[in-house]
Amino acid sequence: EMKDLVNKTGEYIAKLLDVEGATVVSCASAGIAQSVAAVLVKDSDWLLENLHVTPIENNEIVLPKGHNVNFGAPVGTMVALGGGKLVEAGYANECSADQLAAAITPRTAAILYIKSHHCVQKSMLSVEQAAVVARKHDLPLIVDAAAEEDLHTYYRSGADLVIYSGAKAIEGPTSGLVIGKTQYVEWVKRQTAGIGRAMKVGKEGILGLTCAIEHYLTATKESGAE
């Protein structure tokens, strides 16, 4: 059964990466959309099936302005697919922890941080700093680390959900990986009965990425940073 495969592979990957939870999705972009939907819908069966027809008061997703990029599609489009409304913090060339916090309102549902070469690199707060802001305001932190090589650091830095591409650094099939805190990952998995149905990943993608992660964790790394 597909649900059993999703659960078993997720548990196995989580154990490999020493994280609370993990699930395979169709791609990193789907991971963003489903993560946003997850923090909005949570356990609501009504919102799960009526995400785009029911007004949601607390639907703002705050991210640094310099992270609002087009990576092949706009970040804002993925946020909107998940039912969120994008709110930019800071400026195109800088965003501090204080500027991020200043953009938070009672309508804020989550903080989104994009770790990518597409983004502005200088004068931007770190994932660790974003995590501190998120904790202070009792908000989840979602980190899109699609092409990043390190499968541990962003989770350990305090992110509640971290999204990776299965086909980039991991060199697996076209797929995505979402890791994070148990409750948030479970909410992402629920989206298979919501917007995630249109982003469904097949058995081949799930098993292929699982095998690719096994290999990735044991293979000798040739990092561009070396």
PLM region spans:
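Structural signature of PLP-dependent enzymes
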Residues: H215-E226
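Conserved PLP-enzyme active-site core in the AAT-like
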Residues: E1, N7-L217
